[in-house]
Regions:
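Rhodanese-like catalytic fold shared by cysteine-dependent sulfurtransferases
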Residues: 1-11, 15-148, 152-248
């Protein structure tokens, strides 16, 4: 609030999904879901002198968003806003409601290429494999392991129409993993629009949570011919029953 009053050179990025941002937000902030931040930051911040402040509703997603930008080598000073919108409200500061400031601008081709090279290096350093369609099918065909596949591009206007694939924004997949992935240490395949940045960003965080992560090098349309028809091996044993009388 003080920095805004002093008209400092800064931007406030809200790393939550649009639905949460729309409900309540910090005045002057822009909705940029966490996994989109490294992909879109260059369209908004043009000078390294601009301070970047990341907020959420509390603290977790602001820390994840800020650290993601730092990991990508952003030269600006990056801060995570302590206690987020809740702390703002408890400090007797006014929140905005029903705002629609969503950063939809896409980076240019040259910037996307730079970002792609950066994420490829980060994935290699963290031993996360970038795979093609055949490898995706091989992983799905392996009925000895649970494999999930997600489109992590944040898009509040549409959802995936491919059977077996869910659209979950990368930031939310990191924030609420147990809502979407039911098997600990399972395999997870991530993809986006082919830039690899959003899928790679999400994979880097999930790898730290002991999931076996892969990034698909391609777009959604290439996955329409995936075959999800396989048998699940599950052997059940009969349950021994006991009556109330036997318990006496």
């Amino acid at each position: 609030s003080q920095k805004q009053k002093e008209k400092k050179d800064l931007v406030i990025l809200d790393g939550r999904p649009f639905e949460e941002y729309n409900k309540m937000s910090i005045p002057g902030s822009i909705c940029v879901p966490n996994a989109e931040m490294p992909y879109k930051i260059s369209t908004l911040v043009k000078t390294p002198k601009t301070e970047i402040i990341v907020n959420c509703a509390g603290r977790t997603r602001s820390i994840i968003g800020a650290q993601t930008l730092i990991n990508f080598g952003v030269q600006n000073k990056v801060y995570a806003l302590e206690n987020g919108t809740q702390g703002w409200f408890l400090s007797n500061l006014n929140l905005d409601n029903n705002k629609t400031n969503y950063l939809e601008i896409e980076p240019n081709k040259n910037e996307i290429e730079k970002l792609r090279n950066k994420i490829i290096n980060l994935l290699e350093e963290n031993h996360i494999e970038i795979i093609d369609f055949l490898k995706v099918q091989d992983l799905i065909n392996d009925d000895t392991r649970s494999t999930y596949i997600f489109n992590v591009k944040a898009n509040f206007n549409s959802r995936n129409s491919i059977y077996g694939i869910r659209n979950v924004a990368g930031g939310q997949l990191v924030q609420a993993t147990d809502n979407h992935v039911g098997v600990l240490k399972s395999r997870i395949i991530f993809f986006d629009e082919g830039d690899l940045v959003r899928a790679g960003t999400t994979a880097l965080w999930l790898k730290k949570m002991n999931f076996e992560c892969y990034v698909f090098k391609g777009k959604e349309k290439k996955l329409r011919s995936l075959n999800f028809n396989h048998h699940i091996k599950f052997k059940s044993k009969s349950v021994n029953l006991i009556t109330f009388q036997d318990l006496k």
